[in-house]
């Protein structure tokens, strides 16, 4: 495949896939990510996808479209998508571009996104 040597980590936490985007996502990587997530949903039968964009400083119309397409594909496979950690500047850019990301809910951080999908992430309770 591409010679970038960089892949976007996709972790499975129970019934949820956690995708963490960092820095700039090139077109080829974004399209590969879309295929990877769709395949993982299909094979693992997860019910939710959390896309953490707290490490993304700039969103263009292409990335916005890819995020919307990931959410649409997930929905067709009976999984809900939550976008987590959006920076204020990214939110403003999406509005200016007219990208409302239909079918995708948003959360302030990954912990809240997981809770929206019914996964409890209680910290500080119990042992160590």
Regions from the PLM with identified roles:
Residues 6-34:
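STAS-typified acidic loop motif
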Residues 1-4, 119-128:
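Intrinsically disordered or compositionally simple regulatory linkers and C-terminal tails
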Residues 44-47, 51-100:
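Amphipathic alpha-helical interaction surfaces in cytosolic regulatory modules
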Residues 2-4, 13-15, 43-47, 76-77:
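Short flexible coil/turn linkers enriched for glycine and charged/polar residues
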Residues 103-113:
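Short acidic-hydrophobic, aromatic-tinged amphipathic segments that line or gate anion-handling sites
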Residues 33-37, 78:
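Expand to "…catalyze enediolate/carbanion chemistry for C-C bond making/breaking, isomerization
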Residues 114-118:
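Short, charged, surface-exposed secondary-structure boundary motifs
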């Amino acid at each position: 495949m591409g010679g970038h040597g960089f892949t976007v980590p996709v972790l499975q936490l129970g019934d949820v896939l956690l995708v963490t985007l960092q820095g700039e996502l090139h077109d080829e990587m974004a399209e590969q990510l879309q295929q990877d997530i769709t395949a993982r949903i299909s094979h693992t039968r997860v019910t939710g996808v959390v896309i953490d964009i707290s490490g993304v400083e700039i969103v263009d119309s292409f990335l916005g479209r890819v995020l919307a397409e990931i959410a649409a594909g997930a929905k067709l496979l009976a999984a809900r998508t939550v976008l987590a950690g959006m920076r204020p500047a990214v939110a403003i850019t999406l509005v200016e571009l007219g990208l409302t990301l239909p079918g995708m809910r948003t959360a302030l951080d990954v912990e809240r996104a997981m809770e929206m999908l019914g996964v409890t992430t209680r910290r500080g309770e119990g042992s160590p």
